[in-house]
Regions:
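Extracellular, repeat-based ectodomains that mediate carbohydrate processing or recognition
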Residues: 1-247
Length: 247
């Protein structure tokens, strides 16, 4: 079958882990796979299945690695046909599963999807996702977990503003576990813009939301974010029309 939507995370030794969605991996539906590589790009062992629930579709994985090379993967899971949630699963540095997959979101009505993940050096992690049903509009939520995958917070609303929708969140973490979340938003009176907000390691907001892009002509979409250990961060995104035609 076809292989889609890869995500990658670097290991402390310079190697890396790639995860992706695989058409037909679970017999007839999409499943999530992963494989480790050395710092020279050589594969280590065979690819393995990430999800242990194989009914319906498992798609759109995101991955993060801790300071010991252990990794955590989050993805969109179809827990009931045509009803999507967010699942996650922790793995040891040798790719051995450390737990069965578990559901990240508490609120289950509507769609929860487009997840991203950031992992601290000690293995604790945060997952962000797009929620299409908990409030009047599409919104962004986060939840924090310890290294074993046990939740350490409730679902926390990320965006403050009201509008048509917020979508495709991305999250990054500094050395102290402080978070930056970026997302795409279409607010009242605006086209698509990129917004961000800072949180501490417990998910407590440190700022209000703020617009990232300076150019507002056209549409700004699909952000990603990276953060240095000292706290500085970089946001990238697609800009439609800024170069005169497309992105």
């Amino acid at each position: 079958g076809n292989q889609f939507v890869p995500a990658v995370a670097l290991r402390p030794d310079g190697g890396f882990v790639v995860t992706w969605e695989s058409d037909g991996a679970d017999g007839d539906e999409f499943g999530v796979r992963a494989r480790r590589f050395t710092n020279a790009g050589a594969g280590v062992g065979n690819e393995g299945g990430v999800n242990d629930v194989t009914m319906f579709t498992q798609r759109l994985p995101a991955i993060g690695v801790d300071g010991s090379g252990n990794f955590r993967i989050a993805w969109q899971t179809e827990v009931v046909q045509n009803d999507f949630g967010v699942a996650a699963r922790p793995f040891a540095a040798d790719s051995t599963p450390q737990a069965v997959q578990f559901e990240v979101n508490v609120f289950t009505a509507g769609f929860q999807h487009n997840a991203d993940i950031a992992v601290a050096a000690d293995g604790s992690f945060v997952v962000v996702w797009q929620d299409d049903g908990q409030q009047a509009d599409q919104d962004i939520f986060l939840r924090t977990f310890d290294a074993d995958g046990d939740p350490t917070s409730a679902e926390i609303a990320v965006n403050q503003s009201e509008g048509f929708f917020r979508a495709r969140p991305a999250v990054a973490m500094d050395a102290l576990g402080n978070l930056v979340v970026a997302w795409e938003a279409e607010l009242v009176g605006e086209l698509h813009n990129i917004y961000a907000r800072l949180f501490d390691a417990d998910g407590v907001p440190l700022t209000g939301e703020f617009r990232v892009n300076a150019t507002v002509a056209g549409e700004q979409k699909a952000p990603d974010v990276a953060r240095q250990g000292t706290g500085e961060f970089l946001v990238v995104w697609e800009s439609f029309g800024q170069d005169g035609d497309q992105t």
